[in-house]
C-alpha cells in the first residue's frame, strides 16, 4: 500500500449512533433499487450504476502531510495539513481567485417591515463590485423574522434555478426556497442568484466577475465558475457582517446540485460560514471521484467546461492519480458543521459515494470533536444520521431540494447552533 493512502474497505468501526426521522416513514438501511439501477444502466450505458463495477481504489490519507508526517493535533491540521489540502484543491479542481483589487458597497434598495403578513422584514440589498471601471451587482434577497430576538442565525442559499424560486413578493412560493417555514423556525433566510456573479455557460470567461477581475492569459489553475459563485457567497457574508439583525457567527451556506458543489467550496475557502449544507452535490461535490459511479470527472468537464479550473480535465478517466478526493474537500469544513444529503433516485449524483466521502472525512472532525461520528453504513431512507458536527440523510425521490430536506437542515442547525 502506498504511504498516505488507505483502502476505504478498511474503515470499519464500532460505536453508537443516532438515527432521527426526517419524517414518519421507516425503511431499511438504504440501497439503490435494482429496477432503478437497471433502468439507468440501459438508458445511459456509458456510465456505471452497478456497485459490482466500481473499481478498486484507495483514498489519499487526510492526516499525512506532504512531508510524510502524521497529523494528530488541531494545531497541526490548521497550520500545516489544512493549508496543504486547500492548495491542492485550488491548483487541481476549483482554481485560484485572482488578486485583482476591487471595491464593494452595500445598498438596501427595498425594505418592508411587514412582509409575510408581519412575520418578517424583507431586505433587498445590492452588493456592487467595482474594478477599473467595470462593475456588477449581486442582488441579495433576505427575510428576517420579526418575532425573534436579534441578532438571528441565517441561511444563505445559492440559487441556480431562477426568480420563480426566490420571489421577494411571496406571490410565488417554492419548496426549493421555503422562506415562510424557515422564518417560522426563527431563522433568517436569504438568497442570491449565481448568474448575478457569473453566467452558467462557457463564454470563455469574458463576462460576469471573470470579465471584471481576470487579467492576462488564463493559467491552468485559474478559477472556474463554481469558484466565482463561491466568491459571490462570501461577498454576501461581507454584508451580513454589517447587518445588526444577523448573527454573523451563525450563517449557513446552502446549495443544490451545482449549487451544492459551490456551497462546499465556499465553506472550504471562507471559514466564516459556520454551517455548510450540500444538497445532492454529486460529482465535483461530495461524491468520491474514484468510484466512477454515475457522473464522472470526464463527463462533468466535457459538459460544463467552465465550472472548474483547466487542471481538473487532466484527471478525466485517470481519477486514481488525483492528489485529492472529495472526502478531503469535506474535511476542510471541520471543525464547523457539515450536512450532506442525497436523493434515492439521483444515482447520477452517487449517494453512496457522498456518504463514503463524509465517513472518510471523519478523522479530521474527530481531531476537534470525538462526538462527530456517523455509522459505517448508510442510514435508512428518510432518516438522518447525526453526530456532533456532521449529518446526512437520503430522501426518497428525485433530484431536487424540498421542504422535507429543509426541515432536516433546520433540525441539524437547531443542534449545532443551540
Functional labels for PLM-detected ranges:
Residues 358-418:
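C-terminal catalytic histidine-bearing segment of alpha/beta-hydrolase fold enzymes
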Residues 162, 166-168, 234-295, 318:
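Primarily recognizes the serine-hydrolase "nucleophile elbow" in alpha/beta-hydrolase
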Residues 334-349, 395-396:
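Conserved strand-to-loop "acid loop" that flanks and positions the catalytic carboxylate
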Residues 96-152:
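N-terminal cap/lid segment of alpha/beta-hydrolase-fold proteins
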Residues 25-94:
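N-terminal pre-domain segments of enzymes
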Amino acid at each position: 500500500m502506498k504511504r498516505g493512502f488507505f483502502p476505504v474497505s478498511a474503515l470499519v468501526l464500532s460505536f453508537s449512533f443516532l438515527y432521527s426521522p426526517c419524517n414518519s416513514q421507516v425503511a431499511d438501511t438504504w440501497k439503490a433499487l435494482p429496477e432503478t439501477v437497471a433502468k439507468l444502466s440501459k438508458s445511459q450505458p456509458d456510465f456505471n450504476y452497478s456497485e459490482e463495477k466500481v473499481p478498486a481504489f484507495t483514498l489519499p490519507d487526510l492526516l499525512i502531510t506532504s512531508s510524510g508526517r502524521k497529523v494528530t493535533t488541531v494545531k497541526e491540521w490548521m497550520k500545516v495539513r489544512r493549508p496543504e489540502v486547500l492548495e491542492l484543491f485550488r491548483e487541481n479542481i476549483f482554481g485560484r481567485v485572482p488578486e485583482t483589487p476591487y471595491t464593494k458597497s452595500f445598498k438596501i434598495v427595498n425594505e418592508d417591515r411587514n412582509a409575510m403578513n408581519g412575520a418578517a422584514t424583507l431586505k433587498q440589498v445590492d452588493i456592487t463590485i467595482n474594478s477599473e471601471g467595470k462593475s456588477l451587482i449581486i442582488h441579495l434577497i433576505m427575510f428576517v423574522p420579526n418575532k425573534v430576538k436579534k441578532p438571528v442565525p441565517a441561511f444563505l442559499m445559492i440559487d441556480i434555478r431562477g426568480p420563480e424560486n426566490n420571489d421577494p413578493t411571496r406571490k410565488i412560493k417554492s419548496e426549493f426556497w421555503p422562506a415562510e417555514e424557515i422564518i417560522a423556525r426563527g431563522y433568517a433566510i436569504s438568497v442570491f442568484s449565481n448568474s448575478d456573479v457569473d453566467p452558467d455557460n462557457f463564454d470563455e470567461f469574458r463576462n460576469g466577475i471573470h470579465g471584471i477581475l481576470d487579467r492576462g492569459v488564463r493559467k491552468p489553475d485559474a478559477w472556474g465558475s463554481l469558484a466565482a459563485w463561491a466568491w459571490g457567497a462570501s461577498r454576501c457574508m461581507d454584508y451580513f457582517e454589517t447587518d445588526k439583525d444577523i448573527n454573523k457567527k451563525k450563517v449557513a451556506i446552502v446549495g443544490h446540485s451545482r449549487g451544492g458543489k459551490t456551497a462546499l467550496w465556499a465553506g472550504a475557502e471562507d471559514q466564516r460560514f459556520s454551517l455548510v449544507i450540500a444538497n445532492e452535490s454529486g460529482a465535483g461535490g461530495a461524491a468520491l471521484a474514484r468510484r466512477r459511479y454515475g457522473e464522472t470527472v470526464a463527463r462533468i468537464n466535457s459538459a460544463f467546461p467552465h465550472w472548474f479550473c483547466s487542471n481538473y480535465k487532466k484527471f478525466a478517466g485517470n481519477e486514481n492519480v488525483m492528489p485529492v478526493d472529495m472526502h478531503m474537500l469535506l474535511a476542510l469544513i471541520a471543525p464547523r458543521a457539515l450536512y450532506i444529503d442525497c436523493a434515492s433516485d439521483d444515482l447520477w449524483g452517487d449517494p453512496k459515494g457522498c456518504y463514503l466521502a463524509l465517513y472518510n472525512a471523519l478523522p479530521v472532525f474527530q481531531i476537534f470533536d470525538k462526538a462527530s461520528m456517523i455509522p459505517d453504513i448508510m442510514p435508512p431512507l428518510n432518516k438522518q444520521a447525526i453526530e456532533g458536527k456532521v449529518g446526512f440523510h437520503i430522501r426518497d425521490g428525485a433530484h431536487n431540494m424540498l421542504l422535507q430536506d429543509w426541515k432536516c437542515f433546520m433540525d441539524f442547525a437547531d443542534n449545532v447552533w443551540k
